[in-house]
């Protein structure tokens, strides 16, 4: 079944910035996808095409990307008569049409919008749910499907929030839950305790939320943040069942050859500028004190030496995001250098569904885990909820239990778990790192 019409438009993400929405039509109907965008982006990501016209949207317009879909990709795709069930052929067709290494001609945001909408059309053409279609595209085992352990970003720092806290994300993972339904309940209960505790200890403004729905209190050190979270877990009665994870997003505070933990402070203290080795020791102190199970982007995207030195001593899951940007070449280098053991999978970093699947399978082949991720500039699109189930990754982060663009993903996974039923699902829980093997 081929595409009969393609239409793109500008819509808005959760930050109020323009982004690309694409509608693909077949004889089965209309299929839509919206492209997300990040704030802390890796410099090696595929190019998100923005207009750069400062007189409109502060230069963040996507009218060029929208035009590229409507005037170039759409007509060529219709003319090609490619079958929407053949995701690989369509994605490769668009990549060839672009002709650049990082999709800078047409824009990764233009290509990805079409790619994801086509996947929905392909699922409909086969008469199967999107997660099943993705599993078949990836040659993954299907039933019982693996339902992921959610990682909730409950406290925001770094470039996602105010205050002086350098590290970007503090997450909770209900690894001791029996199901996704229970994991959401545990997460919700801890989140509400955390908000109440923060307001009590810091003031009413401490309950304000950041870009991803976590609270964004004015804190200075990760120890303050982790104490709050650990106390909230204990007060909720879920100690042991709910663990902690962190994403420092270290590329954001890597300056010269040092990591500046005071980078948000207008009056920084020189003693807070650390070498890679010193930062590694700092993390080890944190890991010894708190029930942490995962650490993402502990070092900057090109500080290979710090990654390689730290990984063997870490003792927890180490996730590569800015280091690998879902790019097969970067992933292979990271594997060869033994820098991490988990890939953060963001579809808009690479720019097509097929390439995202290939990146996940490359990571799996090296014995790595894969964590599917949203972006900080999100929308109501729920594609990644089906993606995480289809790819059996066993883990996903999609913000907190606040803000509808985050809850959209959590609620979709709830629906999938319910639709499949207990006999056809395995909740990853504490085995989140090896979801694909369950």
From Swiss-Prot:
Chain residues that bind substrate: 160, 169, 296, 321, 373-376, 397
Pathway(s) this gene product operates in, as recorded in its UniProt entry: Carbohydrate degradation; glycolysis; pyruvate from D-glyceraldehyde 3-phosphate: step 4/5
Predominant localisation class: cytoplasm
Matches recorded under Gene3D superfamilies: Enolase-like C-terminal domain, Enolase-like, N-terminal domain
Pfam families in the cross-refs: Enolase_C, Enolase_N
Keywords linked to the UniProt accession: Cytoplasm, Glycolysis, Lyase, Magnesium, Metal-binding
Entry protein name: Enolase 1
């Amino acid at each position: 079944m081929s595409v009969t019409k393609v239409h793109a438009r500008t819509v808005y993400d959760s930050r109020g910035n323009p982004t690309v929405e694409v509608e693909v039509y077949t004889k089965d109907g209309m299929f839509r996808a919206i492209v997300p965008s990040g704030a802390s982006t890796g410099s090696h990501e595929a190019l998100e095409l923005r207009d750069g016209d400062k007189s409109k949207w502060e230069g963040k317009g996507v009218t060029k990307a929208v035009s590229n879909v409507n005037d170039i990709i759409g007509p060529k795709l219709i003319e090609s008569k490619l079958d929407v069930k053949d995701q690989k052929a369509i994605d490769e067709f668009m990549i060839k049409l672009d002709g650049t290494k990082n999709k800078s001609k047409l824009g990764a945001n233009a290509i990805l919008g079409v790619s994801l909408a086509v996947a929905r059309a392909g699922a409909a053409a086969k008469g199967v749910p999107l997660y099943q279609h993705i599993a078949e595209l990836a040659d993954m085992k299907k039933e019982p499907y693996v339902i992921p352990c959610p990682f909730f970003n409950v406290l925001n720092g770094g470039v996602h929030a105010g205050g002086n806290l350098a590290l970007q994300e503090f997450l909770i993972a209900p690894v001791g839950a029996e199901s996704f339904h229970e994991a959401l309940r545990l997460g919700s209960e801890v989140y509400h305790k955390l908000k109440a505790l923060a307001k009590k200890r810091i003031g009413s403004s401490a309950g304000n939320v950041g870009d991803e729905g976590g609270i964004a209190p004015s804190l200075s050190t990760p120890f303050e943040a982790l104490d709050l979270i650990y106390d909230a877990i204990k007060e909720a009665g879920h100690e042991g069942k709910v663990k902690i994870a962190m994403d420092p997003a270290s590329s954001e505070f890597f300056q010269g050859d040092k990591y500046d933990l005071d980078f948000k402070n207008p009056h920084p203290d020189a003693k807070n500028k650390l070498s890679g080795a010193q930062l590694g020791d700092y993390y080890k102190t944190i890991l010894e004190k708190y029930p942490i199970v995962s650490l993402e982007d502990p070092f900057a995207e090109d500080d290979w030496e710090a990654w390689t030195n730290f990984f063997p001593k870490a003792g927890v899951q180490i996730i590569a995001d800015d280091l690998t940007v879902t790019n097969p070449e970067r992933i292979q280098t990271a594997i060869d250098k033994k820098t991490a053991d988990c890939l953060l999978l963001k579809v808009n970093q690479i720019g097509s569904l097929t390439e995202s699947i290939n990146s996940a399978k490359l990571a799996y082949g090296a014995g790595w885990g894969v964590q599917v991720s949203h972006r900080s500039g999100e929308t109501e699109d729920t594609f990644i909820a089906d993606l995480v189930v289809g790819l059996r990754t066993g883990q996903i982060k999609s913000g907190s239990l606040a803000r509808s663009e985050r809850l959209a993903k959590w609620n979709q996974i709830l629906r999938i778990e319910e639709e499949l039923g207990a006999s056809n699902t395995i909740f990853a829980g504490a085995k989140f790192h090896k979801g694909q093997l369950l």
